[in-house]
């Protein structure tokens, strides 16, 4: 297969104003995507965006390109999972999201969903890239596309989310803190939980275009932890900027990550006799999850890092539950992509159904100490091929033996080298991670 030039593991992403996230590029991308998608079936696409200030500029450019290719567009501010869901209900040929997910406001990106609400196949992404090499042309005036606003997009998605929560349950006995990262779920998630009966306290629900993911949300739960303790809430839930990640916090302020959420959902499905197959994690998934699932007799496999690879393994095994510890939780019996609100609701259903607290549920899985170091580099060359870095990794692996793991990889979405070390002794794990990280820094 040819190598993709622009598309990464989660669409096209970068710093706004620099290639490829410029109005010129996005206009051409919209045109090329429109040309390719119009050959697949209906000439209709859905567009959603998060709360970044640059989203308005990029949306206009994308709409112009799609219109030049003759595609009709249905638009509205909505989370990534809502785009995946509504693409199917609108019978659109594709869904397009303008977002950089958990990244800061000065980044943005474009990602596509197929008509089935799943990530676009590699072949379609390659076809779009090939089309971009051609000169931009315009369909005849009578064939030009047009953009339409979906006025009830939020309401449609709220009802969908509520529909994934068991009808015999409600949340009337629970106080919940909801952190929306000043992102796309700010006008949706609080209403979902309120309409199910919960007492809801909100943080991260005042977007201004530049505060998305800023010390709030799934990538930084310190504010949520403090608010849960201050309000004496039963638990808290944090979403990221585009709503496809979720991290929870128990009543004692402990973080409950994507691994633990998947474990809770799988164990509850097993308790109800409804578990189909096993669970897919990634190379970053904590060893504690693997051990806990094994003790329950639940099969477990690892994929490469990235929700698209988790999805590939789920489809390969015909399983339903997959997750990344960063908070991407995929529940294929509910929706075709990672959905923070829906995943959180399934944990809440387990809390209500088992009459256990979030802490009691998550305590069934003991996390191994794990340290992740992120080293920024210019993106040139590959520090991971350095003899010094390879030697440092091998030295740590020899010390850990069978009691831990080391993983070094390039980020698929940012110019970062990620160093992960996991083992039984927290102090040693921290020391080993810093040793390898220093070797990487010395060779960047």
From Swiss-Prot:
Residue numbers annotated as active site: 101
Phosphoserine modifications at: 101
PROSITE patterns: PGM_PMM
Enzyme Commission number, as recorded: 5.4.2.10
GO CC annotation terms, alphabetical: cytosol
Post-translational modification: Activated by phosphorylation.
Catalyzed reaction equations: alpha-D-glucosamine 1-phosphate = D-glucosamine 6-phosphate
Cofactor note (record): Binds 1 Mg(2+) ion per subunit.
EC top class named in words: isomerase
GO molecular function: magnesium ion binding; phosphoglucosamine mutase activity; phosphomannomutase activity
InterPro entries (UniProt xref): A-D-PHexomutase_a/b/a-I, A-D-PHexomutase_a/b/a-I/II/III, A-D-PHexomutase_a/b/a-II, A-D-PHexomutase_a/b/a-III, A-D-PHexomutase_C, A-D-PHexomutase_C_sf, A-D-PHexomutase_CS, Alpha-D-phosphohexomutase_SF
Pfam families: PGM_PMM_I, PGM_PMM_II, PGM_PMM_III, PGM_PMM_IV
Keywords: Isomerase, Magnesium, Metal-binding, Phosphoprotein
Family: Belongs to the phosphohexose mutase family.
PANTHER family: PHOSPHOGLUCOMUTASE (ALPHA-D-GLUCOSE-1,6-BISPHOSPHATE-DEPENDENT), PHOSPHOHEXOSE MUTASE
NCBIfam families in UniProt: glmM, PRK10887.1
Name of the protein: Phosphoglucosamine mutase
